[in-house]
């Protein structure tokens, strides 16, 4: 029945136009064409003469010409026609308007939508006549035309709307209505709307929406209308509402000047864009091409659910609607029906693919077309590990240093003026003793004070005053730079000293210690991300795409698009964190732009997608507890480097006890440190002399250096170093060496055109000194390195551990997202990506933890030994240094097997220095295993998995960047093929392109016997060093891949190893790219290439890594906790009553209903898997910190906290034997939606975990905010003991949340138990254990499930450690099998204690109160929540 009959052909109008599929060879690359010269009947006769070999599904487009011929429609139809079995027919406007529906050409699928002038009645009649498959329901389009019906449907679906009322007027008697108008309000049907409010016509076709302002704001109204030129609204002084017509009156939502437009394609895909609100000023912002400026935004999890609900409720597959984000909530204010995204090639690809698959899935069975939805790599992200096995990628964690920056500069001065103290108090400096000022208004206040003091000091001359005047002048000049405050490139830090600053690092000689308190003012400027740094970050982001699966097939488009499509769904859980430094945040934004193929400026990307981690210590280094250790190290370092004698054996032992190769090489270059410092100082003097001479040259008057620097600023930079490096005593300030190296490296790279003499020698000597000073400042011995490192990055280590452990907790994901099965093997799987952008200190520290913390025994692990040797040869962790942890899951292994989860550790030293090839080549990896050597070999290579399709187009952003051809070496044989899965061989194909060569993210080095060249492999790009892939212990078979995909393999040839070793490993940055006008980086100097990732180890298990991280955190928790407690106690005595750590004040809102974690949300059903897009990072596990919703089906905030706390126990202390227990959840693909997920845990793991919790030394607190902070990574010791604070203030404790009662109760319970233990020590294990369980049940009034919620239960009732004998604690894990025997007795005992001391009702009321406080705190304070919310935790 697929063919058209002759009668139907004769009846069709001659004005209908046909789009034919890509099967026609003459239609060119676009795949479609429009026949306008022939009549339709002739066309059909031709088709009948050439009976098509295959059935065709005809897709009819029924819309007004303006819509059906629009650019988005044309782009999507072009792509739709690439489906072999689809033929697209466009009904002409004349046919639609003038022909009866019986004469309209028949079709099997109809895409029809209403717009101005469209006869919707005829379209409905046609659909009844032909009964086609409707993409957008036609009857519901009547409702979409009436805003009253739209709001009614939205309300019925439980979707949040602004508060509104409908005013219906009878046209005959418009004065008869329920409207009472006041000066600053209107009352509609009894509902009062104070100004500002919005007045909307009930007809959706009427775009004359008015917003009325209150008289206090000047009154009048803003009149919105459909865009006319560059205007979308005008202001009117008229303040009275309209007197004729029916309207909807609704509350005005303050949206910070932006509207969010959401575009769905089916219930499972949504794209969101933000635009300037037309209500702001009415001016439409347009780009250079005249298009309205929009930028992609990320939708929160709840907003994605709204998109699905809107799509389903209105039965519109393609549907657009408007979101207002205000007050931490999102509201739907309009549903537009059929609507496309404009100017997004990625959206066009995805839209056509989804529509085509939808049509084929619905209609293909009727025509016996052999078709099924292809299982793609983004459905199951199975990729090759570097060891060659095929596994599912589950988690990518990357810690990345910021990009190239301008030299950092710093000035310190002591201030005692009352105005500075007033400023310090105004911004809350006394709460912590420190204050950081970055915002423009804050810097303006500092500048105002500085100007005032300078005016006063002019009247008081004197030597001391002159020095202070000089510093104030410098402070003033720096703050006045650029003529504006960006808040990114300058900051002022104030530190309170109760007895004055004891010493000044600036070399000031204070005659006596001032008795009065003073403030140390530290001004920092410079350190801005350069255009080169932006290019580096953006390009590295593009390269990172290639670590992710997908992107193969006809819709690949460009390298890495698999990640983009993955990210457009629920399946990519991406969060990007950055410290509060401007260069770090801009690096993160540029990286996100490249990673997600975003467009536009970095600022909106930064605002939308990069989370600041500066409030929790996650990525910033303000740890004071380790300053003593660092001072000792620096003092010893300075002492050694101040010796005017060649290095002797003792110096080598003292300075390089770890035997680092790079350190020994630098020391051999230095020989005598003082003599080298003399040379460096002389070269700096010569340099400043050359700059002064150049400034006298008239031709250099207007000379502009890199990044708009002038010769004056350059001289100022070097003169300060010249003054500070050699002190008055003649000794050298070793701490200035990194700054000197920083400056000369910057000038050699960016200002080489000046031709200054001696810079190369200065670079060589300062680098040698810096290569000693910088790494050794983080510790000289192994123990010092680990101690200092953990002090810097303990919160980050905990966060990494949490990230790794929560990857298999799919159940918590399901609670927030409709992950419906699409028939794939594992529909709900996610790739969890966490990117942490930070500064050099954290990268050094984290690497030190892995190198010296005892991850593996290098004497027993040859691969780790080679990795340590490679790291030892790295002299500098340059810009864009990366430490990448990748977690894979082997679904063929037993869930409890240690081989189930596979961890790889990768590293890159960042951008290449000015000395090309200064970093060592990667060492390559072939895990030495007798099993590997004995196995039969099989030809194949990972890299041959990258087929180059002629039809694939290169990355559009990289088309202008020609790359040199690089031969990619491939091993001839690769043994031990295992774990290969059907349909999983398309990995890394997103890296193929039509370019002759590409950026390879893995460098090459291989024995000559294993080298061969392949036409496929040579066109691959890759993120990792081919050393890893070539030396892998196993790899998929290339022949199998070619056989599966029908590809012909080109002949292979040998390529000598040396040719590969000396080809630059990475050639992705080029002058042509940097200077191309479309890339916006004109004036960039040569951007250095980045070293590829080298695999440090590719055979780690998750248990190994988890135990290692837990051990490192545990080892340093106690001492750190004591130091922090002492610091807090001392500061608490001086703090005001509004202590920042006190519990949140009680707010009033209905308490949230707790739901058990295994319960499925009410909307969970068995539809297709969700693929909702948000063009920006989305969290499939949590709600965005800035958006909390009141939808009827949302999970409670407390539920989310419980889920977060499940992983928290893994961050804390381990049982007596130091081995944590892990609860691995099985995949839920076989369960019904109503069934709770099956949790499998080792026998006794529940009991071990609970006992573990009772023995932990963790602050005793109920306050949920503490738990949130702890999960983010704040060290336990840095969060004060809330119970102790509240005990000091009994009124606060009684009136707020009374957290101490539960703690006291638990103590009494344990005292009772310990008394029993003395009589019967064998039962002590059971008693302590089970009381915890029963107490948790009674306090929380819900059962404690095995292996899942024990952490949060005990966390909230406190953990008294002093009452538990150490010996029984150690024996708990050995006797877990006997614990259930005494359950009833313990239950009765604990019940008696509860009844005696405190009724359980009171405890449960406290719990409800806390839940209420947390939910309201989150709703009321979105700024704080942005830092502390669950989304930030995940």
From Swiss-Prot:
Annotated positions binding substrate: 66-67, 226-227, 261, 275, 339-342
Record-level GO cellular component terms: cytosol; plasma membrane
Stretch list, region Polyphosphoinositide-binding domain: 384-455
Residues spanning the membrane: none
MF terms in GO: 5-diphosphoinositol pentakisphosphate 1-kinase activity; ATP binding; inositol hexakisphosphate 1-kinase activity; inositol hexakisphosphate 5-kinase activity; inositol hexakisphosphate kinase activity; inositol-1,3,4,5,6-pentakisphosphate kinase activity
Region (Disordered): 916-1017, 1133-1193, 1228-1251, 1396-1434
Residue positions binding ATP: 147, 200, 207, 226, 250-253, 259-261, 277, 322, 334-336
Compositionally biased region (Low complexity): 1165-1183
Subcellular location: Cytoplasm, Cytosol; Cell membrane
Catalytic activity: 1D-myo-inositol hexakisphosphate + ATP = 1-diphospho-1D-myo-inositol 2,3,4,5,6-pentakisphosphate + ADP; 5-diphospho-1D-myo-inositol 1,2,3,4,6-pentakisphosphate + ATP + H(+) = 1,5-bis(diphospho)-1D-myo-inositol 2,3,4,6-tetrakisphosphate + ADP
Catalytic EC class: transferase
Enzyme Commission number: 2.7.4.24
Function in brief: Bifunctional inositol kinase that acts in concert with the IP6K kinases IP6K1, IP6K2 and IP6K3 to synthesize the diphosphate group-containing inositol pyrophosphates diphosphoinositol pentakisphosphate, PP-InsP5, and bis-diphosphoinositol tetrakisphosphate, (PP)2-InsP4. PP-InsP5 and (PP)2-InsP4, also respectively called InsP7 and InsP8, regulate a variety of cellular processes, including apoptosis, vesicle trafficking, cytoskeletal dynamics, exocytosis, insulin signaling and neutrophil activation.
Protein name in UniProt: Inositol hexakisphosphate and diphosphoinositol-pentakisphosphate kinase 1
Native organism: Rattus norvegicus (Rat)
Lineage, top ranks: Eukaryota, Metazoa, Chordata, Craniata, Vertebrata
Gene transcribed to yield this protein: Ppip5k1
